[in-house]
Curated annotation (Swiss-Prot):
It comes from Aquifex aeolicus (strain VF5). Keywords: Amino-acid biosynthesis, Aromatic amino acid biosynthesis, Lyase, Tryptophan biosynthesis. This is Tryptophan synthase alpha chain. NCBIfam families: trpA. GO terms for biological process: L-tryptophan biosynthetic process. Pfam families: Trp_syntA. Its EC number is 4.2.1.20. GO terms for molecular function: tryptophan synthase activity.
Length: 262
């Protein structure tokens, strides 16, 4: 379909797994966030998740909730998110950009306008954590018109029937939430349980599956990369961006990416 599929094909040829990096626009301020985004892109990010701040981020843990709050206090609007995407797209023409947004802003701005502007400014697809696949038909129809990829979320509790539904809704990739609850860096992850679920996904779905929620270290990336198509890292990166530790951010991304090379 586009940049996302191309990226997974390229990684497969290189025998690597995808590093999906998430950061929030406008946290701790717009300029620092732009530097942070550039830093993660320069140091090994394969797919970028661009966080759009929202007042009620139900799926997010404490670190990312703070980022939402601060970005909103900084007055970050859709225009700022688009400006950031457009700026990054000029410098990084081949890296897929996913907009991570709750449904309310899409609805408020208008599905048509939201999709059209996103596409114009270099966005490749959306992750909408509070929009289940069975309620996404209307949005997906508009996204299709603008060649935008819908990335649905699956949970540890997803049944086989649900996994099939998630797979059908996905255009180019699926996102498996590794643990129940909210996002956030964790010391230990239940690898065996995650592996079992990812294997179930693979059996029922032919699209790449990336694993997120809790991934923060090289060993997490290596372990999960041994059975999934990639890992999503958010809270650990957002925390460093919030502390304006831009160099540390680049180093963490390099380290995580090392864990995803065979």
């Amino acid at each position: 379909m586009g940049r996302i599929s191309d990226k997974f094909t390229e990684l497969k040829e290189k025998r690597e797994k995808a590093l999906v990096s998430y950061l929030m626009v406008g946290y701790p301020d717009y300029e620092t966030s732009l530097k942070a985004f550039k830093e993660v892109l320069k140091n090994g990010t394969d797919i970028l998740e661009i966080g759009f701040p929202f007042s009620d981020p139900v799926a997010d843990g404490p670190t990312i909730q703070v980022a939402h709050e601060v970005a909103l206090k900084n007055g970050i609007r859709f225009e700022d998110v688009l400006e950031l995407s457009e700026t990054l797209r000029k410098e990084f023409p081949d890296i897929p950009f996913l907009l991570m947004t709750y449904y309310n802003p899409i609805f408020r701005i208008g599905l048509e306008k939201f999709c059209r502007l996103s596409r114009e400014k270099g966005i490749d697809g959306f992750i909408v954590p509070d929009l289940p696949p069975e309620e996404a038909e209307e949005l997906k129809a508009v996204m299709k018109k603008y060649v935008l990829s819908f990335v649905p979320l699956g949970a540890p509790t997803s049944t086989r029937k649900r996994i099939k539904l998630i797979c059908e809704a996905a255009d180019e990739m699926t996102y498996f939430v590794s643990v129940t609850g909210t996002t956030g860096a964790r010391e230990k992850l239940p690898y065996e349980r995650i592996k079992k679920k990812v294997e179930e996904y693979r059996e029922l779905c032919d699209k790449p599956v990336v694993v997120g929620f809790g991934v923060s270290k090289k060993e997490h990336a290596r372990e999960i990369g041994s059975f999934a198509d990639g890992v999503v890292v958010g809270s650990a990166l957002v925390k460093l961006a919030g502390q304006k530790k831009i160099e540390d951010l680049g180093n963490l991304v390099k380290e995580l990416k090392e864990g995803l090379r065979e």
